[in-house]
Each structure stands twice: as C-alpha cells, then as structure tokens.
Amino acid sequence: VVAVEPSVLIDATAVPADRGGVGRYVDSLVAALDADGARITVVCQPRDARLYDQLAPRSRVVPTVQSTATRTARLTWEQTTLPMMARRLAADVVHSPHYTMPLASPAASVVTLHDATFFTDAVLHSSVKARFFRAWTVTALRRASLCVVPSVATANELAKVTRVEAADLEIIEHGVDVERFHSPTPEEVRAARDAIGLGRTPYVAFLGALEPRKNVPALIRGFARAVLDRPDPPALVLAGQPGWDTQVEKALDAVPHRLRVIRAGYLPFDTLAGFLGGSELVAYPSLGEGFGLPVLEAMACGACVLTTRRLSLPEVGGDAVAYCGVGAGDVAAALTELLDDPSRRANLAAAAQRRAKEFTWATSAERHREAYAKAWSRHRRAR
C-alpha cells in the first residue's frame, strides 16, 4: 500500500454495454481497488450505476448526466465535463482506462493502453477505428502523467512504433475473476450445454468477437480438417459477439455437412465457466493480443487451451497451454494431436488452472495504486 494515497477518479464511461475485455478489466479493477481500500470515485454511464454500486460499495459512484452513449458524445463529455468534475471532486488523479484522456484536466492522468495492434496490424481493425486509436495512443504517450500496459509484449511493441521507451511504461498484468471463471460444477456444464443446444456432443470451444485478429476462419478450416475422418467428431462452438470478419461466413460455408459448427452468439456470463470448463479444449488461435484475457479465463476454468505464441499470449499461457501456428494446417495438426491424447489434455488443464491462480485482481489493484501515486508525484513536480 502506498504511503500517501491520492484520490482517484476512474472514468468508466468507455465500457460498452456488453462489457467485453475492457469492461471486464474496468469492472474487476474497480472491485479490487474498492476492496483494497483505495480512495476512488467511479464515473459511469447511467445504465452501469447500479453495477458499480454493487462492485464498489465503499466508493462513490457518479452516473453521467448528459448522454455519453455514442463515441462522439463521450469524447465531448470527456474533454469538457470530466475535467470540471475532477476539479469539483478535488481528484488528484484521473484514470482513463481505454486509450483516450481529458487533455485539460487539473489532475494527474493515468491512461491504460491495451495493445499496439492499431499500429502493427492495422488491417485487423476497421480503418476508422485504427486511425482513431493510433492518434489517441500517441497523444496519451505524450500527454499523460503515466501510461499503463498489460504485458511486456505490448510495452515492447509500443516502443517499436512510437517514441516511447518500454521502460517508461508501467506494466501491470490483468487478473482473473475467480467467482465467474472457475472449475464448473456438473450442473453448470449442463446449463451451458442447454443454452447452446448441444445435448451430449463433446465440443471444441471458442469465446471471443468474430473479428479478423481472432483468426476464426483458420480455426474453422483447421477444425474441419482435424475432425472430418473421426468416427464421432466433436462440434465446434463459436461463442461471442458477431464481428466484422467477412471471411468467417466463407469458412463456415465450406464445412462438410456431417460436421457441426454452432454459432452460439453472446452467452450470459453465468454460463461461461460451464462452457469453457466443459469443453474438450478451448481453441484461441489469435493473431495477437495485448494481454489475452480469454486465454487466462479459460485456464481458470480448468480447460485445456490451444493458442498461439503471438505477442503477449506466452506471457499468460507459459508452459500450461498448447501452442500452434496461425494457419489452418497448423491449427488442424494441433487439434488432432490434442483430441487424440486425453491424458495430455488433462495434464494441460490441471497446469493451466494452477498457473491462472498467479494472476489476481488484488495484485493488479495494488500495482495500480502504486501507479496512481507515481503519476500524482510526477504531476506535482511538473507544476
């Protein structure tokens, strides 16, 4: 715990309604900071006020008055109302947890930058989104008192594409919500199967948005190759928000009719442990992540995980997951090997769950408190 505790205003207005990775980061961090006794105020969209009241019962929660539902409205609010709010609340630090930040705030500023793929793999994002986040990343690196990144890989990637030194970035790993992501009970597995309509069919699981960097077309093609000649093939279940990867439909159309690929769409949070932990294995052949929360969450559920060595994923998986290349052939070979070897899957699942225990939101909250104190100290020296 830091010696002199700054008061921190956390801007949770950028959290999308479906939560996603940034939502899980902000929600879990706020809860852990509150439990740790940090001096925080959370400003959020009105729809999230009750949630943050529950997550942070010791802290002040302030819903926005004017609309921040669209990106333009939120940015306008961030640049005008948020600095006034920081002044009124006498906040020492404003934490902006998703790239953008108020440029005229009286407080010290901490900005979380989640990954560098807007620079390194811009084609994996829409062009508008890539330009927007590139511009704000550069601005945050130049203007913020301190920038937080979730992995060594992200720090190194940002150092390559901007003028920042990796050592100047605060590397703070995410944790995992063990109440939500845990070894599922048989009832939880059954409930997840019922939600998907699977019956008793074994399945390979994927959880994430269907966007290009998740590499879902290669997963679909690799899965089809791996299981086509099996007498009793498992299903492939794609769970998560629909994205904008146009190649997914083409890959699905090419799947032989005797194989089952299920697009489960958005699954309620209370079914995720059963979905991940009840699978034969979780496949996540991503082209690159800033951290890799879906991999960590699957590990915490006691799943055997197959992922890639791209960017931060080995920092999360260590020796407790299986790795493959990003091509369909690579995915097919790795899936075949794992499906043929139940004992290896069981060993990896046990190792994954042990490793997942090393990533806690309590530790992340402690490190964020140190970052807030450092940012506040820098800000006072600069005035």
Where does each model-flagged region fall?
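Carbohydrate transferase catalytic cores enriched for Leloir-type hexosyltransferases
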Residues: 1-383
